[in-house]
């Protein structure tokens, strides 16, 4: 159960500074993009990779995220809100946590 709670906590927080990797995407060239999130908008993550800055849409993607010593998979549709709105809606995310795996 603790893993699910950490997943919900992750969904409801700002992602800037987290390490992420795109593991599923309708755009096959995005799969494998890995780096640190340097900016976040409602619909995109800006990821600094070894090859430079990449902008990846959230919707329709699945991300591997390194958070508090754990690796989690998060569906981008669950975080497709402005970061400040996700934080305000933290309790609502409990109901949507079906997309969180450890």
From Swiss-Prot:
Enzyme class: hydrolase
Listed name of the protein: Ribonuclease P protein component 1
Reactions listed under catalytic activity: Endonucleolytic cleavage of RNA, removing 5'-extranucleotides from tRNA precursor
Family: Belongs to the eukaryotic/archaeal RNase P protein component 1 family.
GO MF entries: ribonuclease P activity; ribonuclease P RNA binding
Job of this protein: Part of ribonuclease P, a protein complex that generates mature tRNA molecules by cleaving their 5'-ends.
Gene3D superfamilies per the UniProt record, alphabetical: Ribonuclease P/MRP, subunit p29
A GO cellular-component term linked to this record: cytoplasm
Gene Ontology biological process terms, A to Z: rRNA processing; tRNA 5'-leader removal
Keyword annotations: Cytoplasm, Endonuclease, Hydrolase, Nuclease, tRNA processing
HAMAP family: RNase_P_1
Keyword Hydrolase in annotation: yes
Highest taxon of source: Archaea
Species in which this protein is naturally found: Archaeoglobus fulgidus (strain ATCC 49558 / DSM 4304 / JCM 9628 / NBRC 100126 / VC-16)
Localization (cell): Cytoplasm
EC number(s) stated in the UniProt entry for this protein: 3.1.26.5
UniProt xrefs under Pfam families: RNase_P-MRP_p29
Keyword Nucleus on entry: no
